[in-house]
């Protein structure tokens, strides 16, 4: 009863006004959809099918409003209470419309917003950059699951039979066009068709998944009829991928196509000339595609199969709608680019390797062609053949065999000699040759003779020629050169080398002898020093003892003996005191007590 009273309080004029507004809006949408078809073959039926997820929801909210408006009009004007018939009609009505009525009436304007603001700009303004001939195959697949939903069709909607007939006709036309285009492509692009047929089921699977997402969103919206505003947002998010996902494809398709064209142009392995049309995609389409991709990456996290979307469309059909069907079909077959792109770099590298191999083979052929010509003028002979001739000794930087030098550095030596020969007025080209020989395997020497038409060229002329190219000879491993007359000088030079070595050894030996002599002198000096130190040390001790104790140890006996000898004559001759030894007697007389003390000290010791 509370619900009935709450429904009766609504003003009777509000529901008719809302009905008029909703009907007018959808009639305008129908007229706009029928007058302005899509640029890529979109019909009014396809537009209506796309509008079903958003347009059916307000229609569900219209029927309860109609019944409520009629029921409210049946009440008595003056009594303020509904009549019995009005109450019976309200009781028979499903109860869910009573408590949903206020929210549906308040939120019906929210449902009109996305349909008017979101759907039509995407289909009219951005159709040039979004739609493609390959999308024309997808669009009939989108409305196929929609008639299965238990939804209330609007009064202006076409019956399903007519729609099915039109869809079947369109599909038949498209199939015929596709078959014609495939026949033409099979003649021109035989390697392309294999991957193209693999791309078709992916396109259809994507169309089925996108179409299955939209009815799922509408079903969940009807189940959660309490939150109409949130369901409107879900409608936008569910319709977003189905309409805007093709805009993501230019960013992923165009760079790969351009790279593949550049790589195929470098390798000169272009499989078909018809593909050149679709690769001319302007930067504006790619910029719009990047913007659309950035928007989708933030809005739709629920779609996990975005990396597979580039296999559905290509931007060439959107930018060039007036192209022949072959160009549009090649744009639809552009998903095979990733498969072919993996093969083109290898082909390009193979092409470059082939070119490099050809160049190397050409150089090797030229070198091989020169070797026989050089071998006739640069010859290795035995040492016995050069004995007694005016040969020149070439001192090499390394121990190299004659044959190895002839093969690797003989042409360079020949070229250097050819440059110098005209200056010295020697024979013409081909009238002379160079003979080389190695006297011993251990020495880094080669013997060279220059033989002309008149015989062996004198060594002085050869030396003058080699003097002009001395720096160039160092580059090919010839350190210096000498003549046969300087062979003895070379031996003496070796001897002089030994002499210098001997001199160095003698000098080093002399230095060692000097060092040894100095060592012996130092040892002798060290032996003399202890003796000198011992003597001086004894004298110092005696002096110290005499100075400290006044005790002349060695002189005591001598003094006492002298005093004893002096006393005897003094006793015998009494006048001896005045004689020359009187001073000793006086000193002895004075030292008597000291002498007794000394003897006492000696006894103590």
Curated annotation (Swiss-Prot):
Q: Tell me how this protein sits in the membrane.
A: Single-pass type I membrane protein
**Signal peptide per UniProt:** 1-32
An example Gene Ontology CC term for this record: plasma membrane
Q: Where is the composition biased (Polar residues)?
A: 207-217
In this chain, the stretch annotated as O-glycosylated at one site covers 129-134
Which Pfam families does UniProt cross-reference here?
A: CD34_antigen
Q: Which residues carry this modification: Phosphoserine?
A: 570, 596
Where is it chiefly localized? membrane
> What happens on changing residue 118 to F?
Remains sulfated. Not sulfated and reduced rolling of Jurkat T-cells by more than 50%. The rolling of Jurkat T-cells is reduced by more than 80%
Compositional bias segments (type: Low complexity):
241-255, 288-298
The record's subcellular locations are: Membrane
Segments in the Extracellular topological domain: 33-500
Q: What does the similarity note say?
A: Belongs to the podocalyxin family.
- Summarize subunit and interaction data from the UniProt record for this chain: Homodimer; disulfide-linked. Interacts with SELL, SELE and SELP.
Report what the protein is called: Podocalyxin-like protein 2
- The species is Homo sapiens (Human)
């Amino acid at each position: 009863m509370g619900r009935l009273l709450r429904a009766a309080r609504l003003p009777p004029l509000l529901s008719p006004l809302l009905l008029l507004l909703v009907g007018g809006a959808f009639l305008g949408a129908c007229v706009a959809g029928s007058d302005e078809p899509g640029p890529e073959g979109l019909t009014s039926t396809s537009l209506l099918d796309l509008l079903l997820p958003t347009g059916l929801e307000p229609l569900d909210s219209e029927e309860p409003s109609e019944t409520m408006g009629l029921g409210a009009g049946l009440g008595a004007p003056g009594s303020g209470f509904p009549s019995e018939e009005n109450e019976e009609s309200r009781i028979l009505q499903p109860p869910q419309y009573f408590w949903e009525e206020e929210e549906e009436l308040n939120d019906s304007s929210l449902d009109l917003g996305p349909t008017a603001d979101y759907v039509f700009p995407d289909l009219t303004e951005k159709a040039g950059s979004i739609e493609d001939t390959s999308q024309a195959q997808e669009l009939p697949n989108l409305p196929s699951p929609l008639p299965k939903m238990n939804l209330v069709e609007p009064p202006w909607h076409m019956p399903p039979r007519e729609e099915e007939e039109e869809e079947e006709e369109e599909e038949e036309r498209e199939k015929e066009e596709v078959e014609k285009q495939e026949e033409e492509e099979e003649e021109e692009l035989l390697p392309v068709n294999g991957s193209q047929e693999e791309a078709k089921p992916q396109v259809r699977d994507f169309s089925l998944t996108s179409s299955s997402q939209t009815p799922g969103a509408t079903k969940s919206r009807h189940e959660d009829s309490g939150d109409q505003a949130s369901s409107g947002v879900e409608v936008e998010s569910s319709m977003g991928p189905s309409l805007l996902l093709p805009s993501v494809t230019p960013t992923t398709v165009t760079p790969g196509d351009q790279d593949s064209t550049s790589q195929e142009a470098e390798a000169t392995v272009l499989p078909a000339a018809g593909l050149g049309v679709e690769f001319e995609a302007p930067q504006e389409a790619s910029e719009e595609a990047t913007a659309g991709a950035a928007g989708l990456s933030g809005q739709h996290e629920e779609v996990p199969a975005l990396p597979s979307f580039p296999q559905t469309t290509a931007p060439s059909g959107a930018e060039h709608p007036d192209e022949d069907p072959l160009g549009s079909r090649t744009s639809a077959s552009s998903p095979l680019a990733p498969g072919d792109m993996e093969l083109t770099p290898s082909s390009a590298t193979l092409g470059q390797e082939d070119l490099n191999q050809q160049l190397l083979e050409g150089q090797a052929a030229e070198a091989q062609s020169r070797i026989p010509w050089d071998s006739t003028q640069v010859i290795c002979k035995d040492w016995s053949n050069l004995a007694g001739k005016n040969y020149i000794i070439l001192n090499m930087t390394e121990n190299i065999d004659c044959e190895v030098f002839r093969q690797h550095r003989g042409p360079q030596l020949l070229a250097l000699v050819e440059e110098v020969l005209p200056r010295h007025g020697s024979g013409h080209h081909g009238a002379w040759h160079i003979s080389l020989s190695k006297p011993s395997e251990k020495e880094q020497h080669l013997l060279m003779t220059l033989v002309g038409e008149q015989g062996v060229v004198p060594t002085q002329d050869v030396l003058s020629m080699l003097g002009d190219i001395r720096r160039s000879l160092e580059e090919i491993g010839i350190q210096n050169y000498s003549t046969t007359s300087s062979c003895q000088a070379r031996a003496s030079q070796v001897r002089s080398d030994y002499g210098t070595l001997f001199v160095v050894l003698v000098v080093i030996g002399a230095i060692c002898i000097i060092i040894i002599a100095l060592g012996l002198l130092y040892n002798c000096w060290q032996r003399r020093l202890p003796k000198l130190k011992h003597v001086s040390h004894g004298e110092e001790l005696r002096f110290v003892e005499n100075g400290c104790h006044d005790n002349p140890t060695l002189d005591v006996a001598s003094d006492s003996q002298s005093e004893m000898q002096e006393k005897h004559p003094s006793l015998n001759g009494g006048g001896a005191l005045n004689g020359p030894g009187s001073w000793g007697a006086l000193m002895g007389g004075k030292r008597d007590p000291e002498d007794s003390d000394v003897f006492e000290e000696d006894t103590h010791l």
